[in-house]
A protein has these predicted regions:
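Acyl-donor binding region in acyl/amide transferases
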Residues: 42-45, 93-202
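Replication-associated primase and helicase/ATPase modules
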Residues: 1-19
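Short, P/G- and charge-enriched loop/turn segments at secondary-structure junctions
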Residues: 59-61, 198-205
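Short, cationic low-complexity segments
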Residues: 228-236
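A short helix-loop-beta-strand connector motif used in the catalytic cores of GNAT acetyltransferases and
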Residues: 63-78
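Short amphipathic alpha-helix that is part of the acyltransferase structural core
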Residues: 23-65
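Short hydrophobic/aromatic beta-strand or adjacent loop that forms the aromatic wall/cage
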Residues: 69, 210-215
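Conserved beta-strand in the GNAT
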Residues: 73, 80-97, 106
Length: 236
């Protein structure tokens, strides 16, 4: 999933961790200039087009997720005349691409631009809005393939449910990675045998991720009960 990232390396994830684990209500001074305080940011929902642009520009996947139910974003102040300034971070919440026995909503993209903004503040505001909309259990996955460990979720007091085993997440077709959902959309299947029959002159190999760290947050007692039924553990 996509997760906290300007680019997809571990160093950036660590830098993001430094940013978000600082105080979000006051400027957190860093050697390179510090983070923008949450008090100077505006939280908004529904700014999907602008948020999609951020994903295409800054997120390592360069792909907008499917089945999006809500987009939350942070904006700089609009200045003297009020209103919103530029978007500086966005979070996409979707119906999960993997099947769950009960309804949950998944954080499928978390992205920031060049400005150092407190992503924990964005996740927290999104959680409040999702609870208002009736959701009771949030999940997200930090992709080890991209060097992500889930520092934002830890700093946001989410529960850690362990690391999922390596899984087939798509195909490599003539050297280019295609996620499983993209294969289904483009070709009507993600079966390697069927794809090889469809494209006999292409090189097609399965792609496996390195496993994903699972994090979750219950929004009330109903969500806690659902998490227990789903076998989600507390800080495995």
């Amino acid at each position: 999933t996509g997760y906290v990232s300007k680019v997809g390396d571990g160093e950036t994830a660590m830098n993001n961790a430094t940013i978000v684990e600082g105080r979000t209500t006051a400027r957190h001074h860093l050697a390179d200039g510090g983070a923008i305080p949450a008090s100077s940011l505006h939280f908004r929902t529904g700014r999907r087009q602008e948020a999609e642009g951020m994903v295409l520009t800054y997120h390592y996947s360069k792909r907008v997720p499917s089945n999006v139910q809500m987009v939350g974003s942070l904006h700089l102040d609009g200045g003297l005349f009020g209103g919103d300034g530029p978007m500086v971070a966005a979070a996409f919440w979707s119906i999960p691409p993997t099947r769950w026995a009960e309804p949950v909503i998944e954080l499928t993209r978390l992205v920031r631009g060049d400005d150092r903004v407190p992503l924990t503040f964005l996740v927290s505001r999104c959680a409040k809005e999702l609870k208002r909309q009736g959701y009771d259990l949030l999940v997200s996955f930090a992709d080890r393939t991209q060097g992500h460990e889930g520092y934002v979720y830890r700093a946001s007091n989410w529960n850690y449910a362990g690391c999922r085993e390596r899984a087939n997440d798509g195909m490599v077709i003539d050297g280019a990675f295609h996620p499983g959902r993209t294969c289904n959309s483009l070709f009507g299947t993600r079966s390697i045998d069927k794809l090889r029959q469809m494209f006999p002159h292409k090189t097609i190999e399965p792609h496996y991720d390195e496993g994903k760290h699972c994090y979750w947050l219950a929004l009330g007692k109903r969500g806690e009960a659902k998490a227990a039924r789903l076998g989600l553990t507390h800080n495995a």
